[in-house]
Amino acid sequence: MGFSPKTLVAFCWTVLFIISFVHCLPMTHGGKPGYGIERTIIRPEWRCYVDEGCPKGQGAPCEKNCKNVADYGICIGIKCCCFDVIPVPPT
């Protein structure tokens, strides 16, 4: 028995979906995908500065400015903080 074209197409889409999902996961300090097991803690080497847009809820300029020095940017209160790994808050 062979595989029908419908089965092959479904299999290929499934493989493509799984590969793209794993590829898009945030990276941890060890350089492997973050599956939610390891938690990132706030590190002192974060670079933070006061940003006028953060209190107004405008995080896009913060993200854009941080791309020059790090991977991500996030507004924390009135400060924009740049960092290299997406933080996971402790539960």
UniProtKB/Swiss-Prot annotation:
S-S bonds: C48-C82, C54-C75, C62-C80, C66-C81
Presence of keyword tRNA-binding: no
Protein localization: Secreted
First-listed, main subcellular location of the protein, grouped into a coarse class: secreted
Signal peptide positions on this chain: 1-24
An annotated GO BP: defense response to fungus
One Gene Ontology cellular component: extracellular region
Keywords assigned by UniProt, alphabetized: Antimicrobial, Disulfide bond, Fungicide, Plant defense, Secreted, Signal
Transmembrane segments: none
Record's protein name: Putative defensin-like protein 104
